[in-house]
């Protein structure tokens, strides 16, 4: 059973336990009535049933889960990835979503230098931007042919061609 990331919980929406979710799925409403896995920040997982989905704006949605009854219950699922079986949303084995690339290992074609893993994909007006993090650097690479040289879904790997200034030292928190 192969899972895909259907969305990410942004935070609570109201006192009734509904949450705001961002998703790049076109047919997200098919998830209503299905069980999904929420991958929590501490690497734990929670199995929940989607009761209702309402469109908010653009790629943002309001989700209601059977098991969540109030705002307090939404705290632990904030920033959780929502994972679902691929077949539920009609994604074939040879089809991919942008969110499937989260966790890909990224290498620079110059010297095959390891840059880190894709941790986020930002949707901008012009193109997506891949956020790549390692222990030392955070790199943002636009999804344009000049920089993206190869995407290998089978090995979960991306080859990029960076330019000076793309890698930034991480700020210690």
Swiss-Prot record:
Pfam families: PRC_RimM, RimM
GO terms, molecular function: ribosome binding
Residue stretches making up the PRC barrel domain: 93-166
Highest taxon above the source species: Bacteria
Transmembrane feature ranges: none
Keywords: Chaperone, Cytoplasm, Ribosome biogenesis, rRNA processing
This protein's GO CC annotations: cytosol; ribosome
InterPro entries, sorted: PRC_barrel-like_sf (IPR011033), PRC_RimM (IPR056792), RimM (IPR011961), RimM_N (IPR002676), RimM_N_sf (IPR036976), Transl_B-barrel_sf (IPR009000)
Keyword rRNA processing: yes
GO BP, one annotated term: maturation of SSU-rRNA
Primary localization class, coarse: cytoplasm
UniProt-annotated location(s): Cytoplasm
Main function: An accessory protein needed during the final step in the assembly of 30S ribosomal subunit, possibly for assembly of the head region. Essential for efficient processing of 16S rRNA. May be needed both before and after RbfA during the maturation of 16S rRNA. It has affinity for free ribosomal 30S subunits but not for 70S ribosomes.
Oligomer and partners: Binds ribosomal protein uS19.
Family to which the UniProt record says this protein belongs: Belongs to the RimM family.
Comment block on domains: The PRC barrel domain binds ribosomal protein uS19.
Name of protein: Ribosome maturation factor RimM
Provenance organism: Fusobacterium nucleatum subsp. nucleatum (strain ATCC 25586 / DSM 15643 / BCRC 10681 / CIP 101130 / JCM 8532 / KCTC 2640 / LMG 13131 / VPI 4355)
């Amino acid at each position: 059973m192969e899972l895909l990331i259907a969305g990410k919980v942004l935070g609570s929406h109201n006192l009734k336990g509904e949450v705001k979710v961002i998703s790049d799925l076109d047919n997200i409403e098919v998830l209503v009535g299905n069980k999904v896995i929420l991958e929590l920040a501490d690497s734990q997982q929670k199995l929940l049933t989607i009761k209702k989905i309402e469109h908010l704006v653009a790629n943002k949605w309001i989700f209601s889960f059977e098991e969540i009854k109030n705002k307090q219950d939404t705290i632990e699922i904030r920033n959780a990835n929502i994972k679902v079986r691929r077949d539920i949303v009609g994604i074939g084995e040879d089809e991919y979503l942008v969110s499937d690339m989260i966790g890909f290992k990224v290498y620079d074609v110059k010297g095959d230098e390891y840059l880190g893993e894709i941790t986020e994909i930002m949707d901008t007006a012009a193109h997506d931007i891949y956020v790549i993090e390692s222990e030392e650097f955070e790199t943002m690479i636009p999804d344009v042919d000049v920089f993206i040289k190869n995407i290998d879904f089978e090995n979960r790997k991306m080859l990029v061609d960076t330019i000076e200034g793309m890698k930034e030292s991480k700020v210690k928190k």
